[in-house]
Amino acid sequence: WEQCACIKYVNPRCGTYEFGYPKSDTVNDTKVCERANQLREQLNLKYDVSVLYAPSWEYADKEDDFIKAVAPLKVNMLIKQAHWSKEYQAIIDNIDEMRAQHEGRYDNLYYIDVTESIMTALDMCDIVVSDESSVMSEALMFDKPSIAVTDWLIPDTEPARLSCVPM
């Protein structure tokens, strides 16, 4: 051992290393639960069960597809879009267009502000519908199942590609 100890690859180091997923710290945070309860009250949800639509990308009227499929069910439809920077104005425009098209037309449709934490939305829902978003992995931390829709197009390439699960 003494002959090899000077080689950096075999010399053990002592130290403290932090591991984990920073968002997992919020799962048991009472502030997230309190905020979710506050938002539930504020939105005055109609039903006991909530389905969260939280895609990576809003593209090709996916929100419209989701709403048409879920609206007839006796569930709350929660929409939580990602908070995009101005560099992605086309995506922001898609989000705004979908909201303008649907908001106020369904008594079981609720929009969660893009600046709200996704963790709050996950605490509020019973199931998640998404494309290839990491939100599906984050939902597991809340013991919430996810449905990955794999035939939705993702516009991060030219031409747009099909979503890929796992992420």
What are these regions (language model features)?
Residues 10-13, 18, 134-167:
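Catalytic binding pocket for nucleotide-activated donors in carbohydrate/polymer assembly enzymes
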Residues 16, 75, 107-110, 164-165:
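Short, conserved active-site loop motifs that form the nucleotide-linked donor/cofactor pocket
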Residues 1, 128-129, 146:
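Short, well-ordered beta-strand core segments
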Residues 90-137:
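Donor nucleotide-activated moiety binding/catalytic core segment of transferases
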Residues 5-10, 68, 90-102, 159:
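Short, aromatic/basic amphipathic alpha-helical patches
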Residues 1, 81-86, 151-154:
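Short beta-alpha junction loops
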Residues 1-31, 136:
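Active-site and donor-binding regions of nucleotide-sugar-utilizing enzymes
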